Amino acid sequence: MSYHKSSGTTLMVPLFMLLISVNYFMSCNAQLSTTFYDTTCPTALSTIRTSIRSSVSSNRRNAALVIRLLFHDCFVQGCDASLLLSGAGSERASPANDGVLGYEVIDAAKAAVERVCPGVVSCADILAVAARDASVAVGGPSWTVRLGRRDSTTSNAAQAATDLPRGNMVLSQLISNFANKGLNTREMVALSGSHTLGQARCIRFRGRIYNSTLRIEPNFNRSLSQACPPTGNDATLRPLDLVTPNSFDNNYYRNLVTSRGLLISDQVLFNADSTDSIVTEYVNNPATFAADFAAAMVKMSEIGVVTGTSGIVRTLCGNPS
């Protein structure tokens, strides 16, 4: 295709659209504030914290589930609690979110907040705060959460299929996927560190055993093969972090250095490529990882937020009203 003399005009249109997008993003984020509920619901944060602490205390796996919920929500349609909506055609019903759990943890936190401040605090804000509190509950970093998100009334299963990263992605695909959400390579590696918590099913890591040329430690490979044969046992769970799966630390990266990453998308972060140096830095400097993770979570939690008079404040997080 040739633009000839019209190419100048053609180039200006995307630039104009880019400026609109940047200004819109900045405008939405500018409406977020750490003091958003100080007068309308001053006990909101303490109520959420108490609820999340209780949930994680009863089952430490809940910390991983909550952090994953925020990630999956923000990567599809922005951080608007659209993932929490139930029903046919919703993100929640998408095969891309098959295996995503923990909705009841957020429902419990929402119910607790509704009892003290009915109709005030959005599910999107509760999810953002809950992820921070879940991290702290298992020894992870804390960060400041700016508030004022509103809840969307729509949810898109098809978009979940295209926007969420997959466990079999290679490094270039991961970098591109995160870049599409405004997150750079270092932030991608830091956020992948959330895999210091939680588990994955055999159906998600089978490719790492049988369909990958990535290095894999022999004993680790043997253990995975026994738990996850070429067919069957799809629901068998294995920890993403072999050493301390219920504590937030940097052992996830130590596993990668010894070729014991559970998913393909884990091990590609340390595979004689551009991100090896970041992984090594996080192995040697856990405080750097914690700081980078916290900063990346702040940035991710403000992707595509709905603010002001847009959206709603749902009474029930699974119901679009």
From Swiss-Prot:
Post-translational modification summary for this protein? N-glycosylated.
Q: Which InterPro entries does this chain map to? A: Haem_peroxidase (IPR002016), Haem_peroxidase_sf (IPR010255), Peroxidase_pln (IPR000823), Peroxidases_AS (IPR019794), Peroxidases_heam-ligand_BS (IPR019793), Secretory_peroxidase (IPR033905)
**Sites where the protein binds heme b:** 195
Q: Which SUPFAM superfamilies match?
A: Heme-dependent peroxidases
Got any disulfides in this one, which pairs?
41-117, 74-79, 123-317, 202-228
CDD domains attached to this UniProt entry: secretory_peroxidase
EC number(s) of the enzyme?
1.11.1.7
Name one process (GO BP) from the record.
Answer: response to oxidative stress
Required cofactor(s): heme b; Ca(2+)
Q: Which UniProt keywords apply?
A: Calcium, Disulfide bond, Glycoprotein, Heme, Hydrogen peroxide, Iron, Metal-binding, Oxidoreductase, Peroxidase, Pyrrolidone carboxylic acid, Secreted, Signal
Q: Where in the cell is it found?
A: Secreted
Question: Binding of substrate: at which residues?
Answer: 165
Q: Name one Pfam family in it.
A: peroxidase
Signal peptide interval: 1-30
Q: In which tissues is it expressed?
A: Expressed in tracheary elements, roots, young and old hypocotyls, and stems in the partially glycosylated form and in roots and young hypocotyls in the fully glycosylated form. None of the isoforms is significantly expressed in leaves or cotyledons.
Give this protein's Gene Ontology molecular function annotations: heme binding; lactoperoxidase activity; metal ion binding
Q: Which residues bind Ca(2+) 1?
A: 73, 76, 78, 80, 82
Q: For this UniProt entry, what's an example GO CC term?
A: extracellular region
Q: Which residues bind Ca(2+) 2?
A: 196, 241, 244, 249
User: Can you state which reaction this protein catalyses?
Assistant: 2 a phenolic donor + H2O2 = 2 a phenolic radical donor + 2 H2O
Determine if Calcium is one of this entry's keywords.
yes
Entry-listed glycosylation sites: 211, 221
Q: At what positions is Pyrrolidone carboxylic acid found?
A: 31
Similarity annotation? Belongs to the peroxidase family. Classical plant (class III) peroxidase subfamily.
The protein in question is named Basic peroxidase
Q: State the gene name recorded for this protein.
A: POD3
